[in-house]
Amino acid sequence: QSAHDTFWDFVGLHTEATHHTFWNMSDRGIPQSLRTMEGFGIHTFRMINDAGETTLVKFHFKPRLGVHSQVWEEAQITGGVDPDFHRRDLADAIEAGAYPQWDLGVQVFPDTKEEMFEGIDLLDPTKLVPEELAPVEIIGTLTLNKNPGNYFEETEQVAFHPGHLVPGIDVTNDPLLQARLFSYLDTQISRLGGPNFSQLPINRPHSPVNDNLRDGMYQQAAHTGIAPYKPNSLDAGNPTETPIDKGAFIDVPRPVEGHVTRRSPASFEDHFSQARMFYLSLTETEKQHLIEAFSFELGKCYEEAIKLRYLDVLAHVDQELAETVADNLGLPHPEQQEVPDASPSPALSQLGKTWPIDGRRVAILIDSDQELD
């Protein structure tokens, strides 16, 4: 729930959130189903081949059913009458054999010293790379073909973490990703009762683990070694790390130069161009839905100063948009602002595409007063 002063005070003062807020207020914020949601990480990762060559990538999951949303009135009714709709819809589809599927794809970028692509900082999590500039290359398919047998054990206890990576995928210096590498681990230790959450069946790797972790809450292994450190001469040097020729992952060395500061680079200071790109990419219907969402949410705020501040944010993206929302709120138009240059990305619109009917419920409406032949 974001229709309150706290949220709009925050995003109005943290304008780097503008692009994200436009996505939230758009039709994508009220998906028709979990089966019709796109999945993509906001971070850039580094892929490494056997020769030690690196490439930067962004991961995408494209739903086979396409990307679809509810309309506002439908979302209000569904949320009030059937708030568990999304989870039940997903479970029902799996149970019926209409297995939800997503195509896994990657956007691939050269791993340059600047870590930029077409003027876009690949380490800035508030920005995306338009698919027209870097097409998504499909490399696999994700299929959900089984419901949990025990929801608590198999879902509630899952410990997701961006640092859980397979050999060949490494992190970048995206500052938000680096923060998440710490915070996710810290959260799982708190949420799942201690440092041994990785021993829970749903989190346990297929291969046995032999490491130096000992004791702690909910420890399930009976360790008998007396030297949980390395190197040691008491346990024959065990445990030892897996060598490279046995599949161990090794970080690729990278040169570093410059000054270490607590400031973001200048490329991070562009807070509005991608929000404008997103807005220009929408159809007129989608734009109208976005305007109505901004008007509804800001209309629930009590502090007029917060509303006026965010109208100024909108003016940095599109003056007509800002003035329309201001009219809906009964507030004066914000001052004209300089808006950034931006071109639409057709891939960001949900409309204008055709998709299969598989796994959908179909309703047939019949008017008894009309001749059907």
Model-inferred region functions:
Residues 1-372:
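Active-site-adjacent core segments of small-molecule enzymes
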